[in-house]
Amino acid sequence: APITATPGTDLDEDGKVKPARATASYKRAFWDAMRLNTSPMEVRNALSEGVDSEGGYLVPDEFERTLVQSLADQNIMRSLAKVIQTTSGDRKIPVVSTHGTATWLDEGKPYGESDEAFTQISLSAFKLGTFLKISEELLNDAAFNVEQYLASEFARRIGAAEEEAFLVGDGKGKPTGIFNPTGGADSGVTTAKPTDISADELIDLHYSLRAPYRARAVWLMNDATVKTVRKLKDGNGQYLWQPAITAGTPDMILGRPVYTSVFAPEVKAGARTVAFGDLGFYWIADRQGRSFKRLNELFATTGQIGFLASQRLDGKLVLPEAIKVLTQKTAG
C-alpha cells in the first residue's frame, strides 16, 4: 500500500521523532529505488524529503555511516585528521594567529594588554563524484548485496581521490593538501641535496616542530621515500627507523609513528617529501547528505544500470605551524 504518512514519523528509543533519513521506511524505499526499474508511488512518497538538487537520493543515515567508515578504512588522512560534519556551505573557523603573553609585574603596577589575535579559516563544500555500472542481471539477483557493493566501490574510488587532495590538492575546486606550498604546512628543513635525505635532516625536521605539537606528531611520506629513510643511521650507527613491536601498529622514527601514502610526493628536486606534525590540525569538513542516482536508460542496450554517487567536502590545515615538511633542494 502507498505510504501516506509524512516521512520522519518513526520514533526512536526515547520516543522522539526520527529524522526522515533515519527511518526504516526511508531506508527500504531508498534501496527499492536503487534496485527497481521504476520508482512506484510509495517509493517516491518515502523519498520526497531526501531528493538532492540534481535528482539523486540522499542515502539513509545508517548507510551514510557505513560509507564514512569505509572511507576511513581506505583513506589514511581520515584516521589522522579532525573530521567535522556540516549541514550547509562555507564553514568559518576562528583560529588563533598570535598568542597573548604574561609578564612579571611590580607591586601596584597596572596589567599590560596582551590579547590573542584571531584569523578565520573558511572550509567550503567541493563536490566529488564517481560513476559506476552494474549489470541488470546481477542487480536483480537476490543474492547480490548491492548495499555492500556500492559502499565498497564508493569508498575505494572516493577514498583515493580524497586522500590525494588532502595531501597535494591545490584548493581549486578541491581541498588544500598539507604538502601544497600555498595553504599547506610550513617548510621546516631544506635538504642539502636535491634527491637525497640524510639522518640529520630528519632529526632537524623533528625539532623544527614546536614541542607542544611533537607530543601528538606523526610522520607521513611516500612508500618510495621509506626505502631511503629505512637505511638512515644516527651518529651512533643506530637506525632511525624502529620497526613496530606489535602487529598492526605503525613503525616509528625518533619515537613517533610513521604512515605512508602513494599520494605523498616522491623524492625529487624542489619537492616537499616528508611531513611531520600533528595532523589533528588538518580539518576535513563533510557536508551531510551523500547521494546516489540511478540511471536506467543510458546503458539499456548493454543490459547495465548506471549509478552516480557524490558527496561534498573540503579539507584544510587550520594551523600551518602544527606540521612541518621536508623540502628537497632545487636542482642547479
Predicted regions and their residues:
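Assembly-associated, polar helix/coil segments characteristic of icosahedral protein shells
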Residues: 1-117, 121, 280
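Short loop/turn segments at secondary-structure transitions that flank enzyme active sites
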Residues: 97-102, 129, 138, 160, ...
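Alpha-helical scaffold segments that mediate packing/assembly in large oligomeric complexes
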Residues: 107-208, 324-332
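Short helix/loop capping segments that flank catalytic or ligand/cofactor-binding pockets
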Residues: 95, 101-105, 114, 141-143, ...
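Alpha-helix initiation and N-capping motif
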Residues: 40, 64, 74, 90, ...
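Residue-level signal for pocket-adjacent positions within structured domains
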Residues: 53, 72-75, 113-118, 123-129, ...
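Intrinsically disordered, low-complexity peptide-like regions
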Residues: 8-12, 43, 50, 160, ...
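Extended oligomerization regions of viral-like shell subunits
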Residues: 59-68, 85-92, 168-311, 324-332
